[in-house]
Amino acid sequence: MMTKVLGMAPVLGPRPPQEQVGPLMVKVEEKEEKGKYLPSLEMFRQRFRQFGYHDTPGPREALSQLRVLCCEWLRPEIHTKEQILELLVLEQFLTILPQELQAWVQEHCPESAEEAVTLLEDLERELDEPGHQVSTPPNEQKPVWEKISSSGTAKESPSSVQPQPLETSHKYESWGPLYIQESGEEQAFAQDPRKVRDCRLSTQHEESADEQKASEAEGLKGDIISVIIANKPEARLERQCVNLXXEKGTKPPLQESGSKKGRESVPTKPTPGERRYICAECGKAFSNSSNLTKHRRTHTGEKPYVCTKCGKAFSHSSNLTLHYRTHLVDRPYDCKCGKAFGQSSDLLKHQRMHTEEAPYQCKDCGKAFSGKGSLIRHYRIHTGEKPYQCNECGKSFSQHAGLSSHQRLHTGEKPYKCKECGKAFNHSSNFNKHHRIHTGEKPYWCHHCGKTFCSKSNLSKHQRVHTGEGEAP
């Protein structure tokens, strides 16, 4: 009937965009009179995500229905792979947003994740402007749905919509075909679903509903501002620094910035490699908390890692792992003199005995050492440094091993026990000397004549015969 009044053909088929202004208005009004609206991508997405297994009689039917719902949402027949991928990325991006930001972004109907990011960045820039207020300024541009709902056609009820002259409906020309036939609705919707949604809003909402939405949007905007400020990188860093200061028992400094006074200062973002974890005992700084924890054990003497074989304790797990290899039978690193080692570093140190290689030299006396640790321990002879002190008697030692051995005099501990005869020792060196009685091992080799000895002291006595200092034993 309506097509006859307007002089249209009774059957409407696809036409070029410039010829579809008339049927566009007619079909929109007919749909509104019936109370039917085009489905949205969001509705199809929700139908796919909320589909339940119990809605179908069996697993095959459930899988088939899921395929149908997925195709209704992603539209693989008209969307490219890149467009489908972008829809999935957009969905996940909206999912990880805070609830307040989700609602705000969805109101703006972004068609891609990049568009959603642009919306959020624009909002952040708006919040960073000086003198920003939570309430909407008078000259602020209204949201899209507010603009449409404030038009004259939106104030009329759907039943009162009348056909408009062609010259007043040019604003719909750029939207493309919306309603052509019943079978063409989905194709028209796929071209621009957001504008169909805007058209639906423009003919459905009344003025009272618009005012209520504007009030809700105002409250939502305040929540959005709080979420954005709380989730800014500098705010997260500020919370971390506050937690770090709380561990030290200090309060972070306060500063005045603009119109906000008493607010905690926001520190700058730490640069890579910055050492923010400081030892309260000596002031040494570290780039991460785990290294600081390990360092603190040098002050407390804590040794939480204990060997289950001999009871020896270590401050680091890596040292315990290296030590535990000494109890294993497997010693894959062999020296040509017959001695075997569990670690390649120990073999290298041992081989320096044969080559007389001593790359680490003392600057004070010129004495050379095969290991860097030996040089450090030797250097304390010149400085007189004895950093390790016994808590029982106050005696100090230049080496930690000396303190550990001394403390066993107070405790009576003898952790080194011989499996052959059961004899126990409080020093590993004494245990090693004793153990060679059972094994017949002679690890100390004279590089002049090739003779071997079971102890270093016997080798020293023997070498005097080559240097002319005394007779060989």
Curated annotation (Swiss-Prot):
Zinc finger region(s), C2H2-type: 277-299, 305-327, 333-354, 360-382, 388-410, 416-438, 444-466
Domain of life: Eukaryota
Residue location of crosslink Glycyl lysine isopeptide (Lys-Gly) (interchain with G-Cter in SUMO2): 27, 221, 232, 349
Record region (Disordered): 127-167, 247-272
Primary localization: nucleus
PROSITE patterns membership: SCAN_BOX, ZINC_FINGER_C2H2_1, ZINC_FINGER_C2H2_2
Polar residues compositional bias, start-end: 148-167
Bias-annotated ranges (Basic and acidic residues): 258-272
UniProt keyword Cytoplasm present: no
InterPro entries in the cross-refs: SCAN_dom, SCAN_sf, Znf_C2H2_sf, Znf_C2H2_type
UniProt entry tagged with the keyword Transcription regulation: yes
Homology family: Belongs to the krueppel C2H2-type zinc-finger protein family.
Function: Strong transcriptional activator. Plays an important role in spermatogenesis; essential for the progression of meiotic prophase I in spermatocytes.
Protein name, UniProt field: Zinc finger and SCAN domain-containing protein 21
UniProt source species: Pongo pygmaeus (Bornean orangutan)
